Structures are given as structure tokens and as C-alpha cells.
Amino acid sequence: MSDSKEPRAQPLGLLEEEELITSSMNFFPRDFGFRQTRGYKSLAGCLGHAPLVLPLLFFTLFTGLLVAILVQVSKNPSSQRLDQSKQDEISQDLSQLKAAVERLCRPCPWEWTFFQGNCYFISNSQRNWHDSITACQEVGAQLVVIKSAEEQNFLQLQSSRSNRFAWMGLSDLNQEDMWQWVDDSPLSTSFKQYWNRGEPNNIGEEDCVEFNGNGWNDDKCSAAKFWICKKSAASCSRDEGQLLSSASASPIAHAA
């Protein structure tokens, strides 16, 4: 073990302390406001109490940060009230728009499809042919009667897309092989091309007609199938069109 003792640090003299402070001042930016030629003695006193200065500095910064947070929090209720007021205003506009839309004249009811001045509805449930007629009558419509090749192509496409075999308003219940629509009009000769190959075959008293695949098929009227209703589209007045324009413009103006 060595008997030598570590040298103890000698306290700085006044001149040495001033030189140390003066040389240290070169590390401070000028923006801090410190000058080497003035006030270095007071700075020496502050540095001499560094353990007290740093906590004081941190406390000041923390206090300032806390005050800033409190100010921001105090502003939140006001901004929330403004946001709520804006939301209430938009909600009121939407309610007015909804009421206006409900009063508007629509060519077809919801879930109905418009085509060439008529409205069509493909059911989601199944009934026999006679009950399908009743179902259409209950909504002011008729089990579909086809009047043109364009209408036939449209309905055949709708039936195929929905993958549903659906009743139409055609049967030979009154007289075998005398096909007649529910409005008592006879089947046009030009429409016979729409029968599927080998149809109508009248196997087992098949007297009612359905959309089946890419054409028509006769089946038992007691079979449960989907059905297609048809009714004339409503005509809308000019004023109702203007109502829609004014109602739809209202929320846009407020939301801008």
C-alpha cells in the first residue's frame, strides 16, 4: 500500500477566480446579455451559488409551463361550447333537409326501380301466383304486364341479376294455351320468342308464367316464388323540384 496522499485541490484566489469567470464568459452567446467587461463580479456570485440557481431556474420554467397549460384548459370550455353550437346548427339543417326530402315527390317509392315511366318492385319473399297478385294490389300496383321488348329485356335482366325466379302477370287459367295478362290483354305473338326452349310444356297443370333464367317458364300457380309488381311513376311538379334545390343548398352554406 502506498503511503502517498492524493493532492488536495487548493482554493482559487480572487484573481484566479476572476480569470476563470472571464474565460468562461466566452462560451455564452451574446444574446444572453452577458458582457465580459461589466458585471462579472455579480456573475461570479451567482455561479458561486449554482446549486441554488439551477433549481430556481427549473422552478421558473415549470411554473411558466403550468400557467400556460392552465390558460389553455380554461379556454377549452368556451371552444367546446362553440363546437357544440356549430354541431347543433348543422344538425338542425340536416333535420330540415330530411323533412324536405320526405315531402318531395319521388317518381318511385323507396326500393322500387324506375324504367321508362314505370316503377318496378321485386319481392324479397315468396308467394303463389294468386297471392302475388294480391300483394301487388295492396301497394297500388299490378303483377307485371309486359308491353314492349325493351321492358322485357329490362325485367329479364333484373330477375337474372337478383337470381330469383319471379312471377309475372301471365297465365292460361281461363283457357288452355290461351295466354292472357292480368289486365285481360292477350299475349302478343311477338312475345312468344321469350319462352325458354321447350316451354310452355304444361307439365302437371302449369298455367302461370315466371321469369326463369334467360326466358319464360310455365309452372304450377300454387308454387311459391318471388314476384314483380309494376305501377306508373308519379309526376313531380316544378315547385317540388325547386324545394329540393333550396333545401339541399341550406346545409352547404352553413358548413362552408
UniProtKB/Swiss-Prot annotation:
This is CD209 antigen-like protein 2. It comes from the Eukaryota. One of its GO terms (cellular component) is external side of plasma membrane. Predominantly expressed in liver and axillary lymph nodes. At very low levels also found in other tissues. Residues 114-230 form the C-type lectin domain. Keywords: Adaptive immunity, Calcium, Disulfide bond, Endocytosis, Immunity, Innate immunity, Lectin, Mannose-binding, Membrane, Metal-binding, Receptor, Signal-anchor, Transmembrane, Transmembrane helix. Gene3D superfamilies: Mannose-Binding Protein A, subunit A. InterPro entries: C-type_lectin-like, C-type_lectin-like/link_sf, C-type_lectin_CS, C-type_Lectin_Receptor_IMM, CD209-like_CTLD, CTDL_fold. It is a single-pass type II membrane protein. CDD domains: CLECT_DC-SIGN_like. Its main location: membrane. One of its GO terms (molecular function) is D-mannose binding. Residues 72-240 are extracellular. It is found in: Membrane. The chain crosses the membrane at residues 51-71. Probable pathogen-recognition receptor involved in peripheral immune surveillance in liver. May mediate the endocytosis of pathogens which are subsequently degraded in lysosomal compartments. Probably recognizes in a calcium-dependent manner high mannose N-linked oligosaccharides in a variety of pathogen antigens. Is a receptor for ICAM3, probably by binding to mannose-like carbohydrates. Ca(2+) binds at E199, N201, I203, E206, N217, D218. Disulfide bonds join C108-C119, C136-C229, C208-C221. In vitro, is a weak receptor for HIV-1 and SIV and poorly transmits HIV-1 to permissive T-cells relative to CD209. It comes from Macaca mulatta (Rhesus macaque).
